[in-house]
A protein has these predicted regions:
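Conserved catalytic/acceptor-binding region of the Class I
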Residues: 51-116
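Core SAM-dependent methyltransferase catalytic element
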Residues: 164-175
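A conserved beta-strand element that flanks and buttresses the S-adenosyl-L-methionine
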Residues: 26
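Active-site charged/polar residues at nucleotide-handling catalytic sites that mediate phosphoryl
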Residues: 20
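Conserved acidic residues
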Residues: 23
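S-adenosyl-L-methionine
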Residues: 1-17
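A short, conserved alpha-helix within the catalytic core of class I
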Residues: 13-15, 31-51, 55-58
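C-terminal helical/coil "lid" or tail adjacent to the Rossmann-like core of SAM-dependent
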Residues: 113-158
Length: 175
C-alpha cells in the first residue's frame, strides 16, 4: 500500500493531479464549497482515472440548534444563501453537493454508497458550538439578508447542542 499526498490548486482542474492513475481519490469537507460544474469536471477526471472515490463531511443542509429559537430558520436560510456564493470554484453547490456528487458518479456507471455523518453536538462541545454559531452569524451578515441587530441577537443566544448534517460518499467503478 502506497499513500501519497499532493498539495495542488484545484481551481485549475484536477486532471493533472490524477495523471498518475491513483486507486483512490479522497477529500474532506470540500464539495459543498465548489460549483456543480467543478463537481462534474472532478467526477469526470476520477472516472477517467478509473479510481475509487471517498469524501467525508460534505454539508447536506441540516442545521439544527438546541435549544431552538424562532430566529433559527432565518439565520440558517441566510447561511445557505451564503453557502451558494463563489469560494473560488464558481457558485458553490452548498447543501446540494452530496446529491450532485452521487448523481454524477451514477451517470458515469459508478456504484455509489452514501451515509449520513452528522455532528451531534452537546454541552461538551461548547467551543465548537460557539465557533459554528459565529460562522453562521458572519455568513448571514455577509448576505445582508439578516439585519445586524438580528444576527447579533441570534449569535448571543446560549446554545447547548445541535446537529450539523454531513454526508459521506463512496463510489467505485461499476462492472
Amino acid at each position: 500500500l502506497e499513500v501519497t499526498f499532493e498539495k495542488r490548486d484545484l481551481s485549475r482542474g484536477v486532471g493533472p493531479v490524477l495523471e498518475s492513475k491513483p486507486d483512490l481519490v479522497t477529500a474532506a469537507a470540500f464539495f459543498d464549497l465548489v460549483s456543480s460544474d467543478f463537481i462534474r469536471s472532478f467526477v469526470g477526471s476520477v472516472v477517467e482515472a478509473r479510481a475509487a472515490f471517498l469524501t467525508v463531511l460534505t454539508y447536506n443542509g441540516i442545521s439544527q440548534w438546541a435549544p431552538r429559537h424562532p430566529l433559527d430558520q432565518s439565520i440558517i436560510s441566510a447561511f445557505h444563501h451564503h453557502q451558494a456564493t463563489d469560494k473560488g470554484f464558481g457558485p458553490a453547490s452548498g447543501p446540494t453537493a452530496p446529491a450532485h456528487l452521487a448523481d454524477q458518479f451514477k451517470i458515469n456507471g459508478y456504484i455509489v454508497s452514501e451515509g449520513d455523518s452528522p455532528w451531534r453536538l452537546n454541552d461538551s462541545h461548547a467551543q465548537l458550538i460557539a465557533d459554528l454559531r459565529a460562522g453562521h452569524v458572519a455568513a448571514a451578515r455577509d448576505t445582508k439578508l439578516i439585519d445586524a441587530d438580528t444576527a447579533t441577537k441570534w449569535g448571543a443566544l446560549d446554545r447547548t447542542g445541535g446537529v450539523i448534517g454531513h454526508t459521506d460518499t463512496f463510489a467505485v467503478p461499476g462492472g
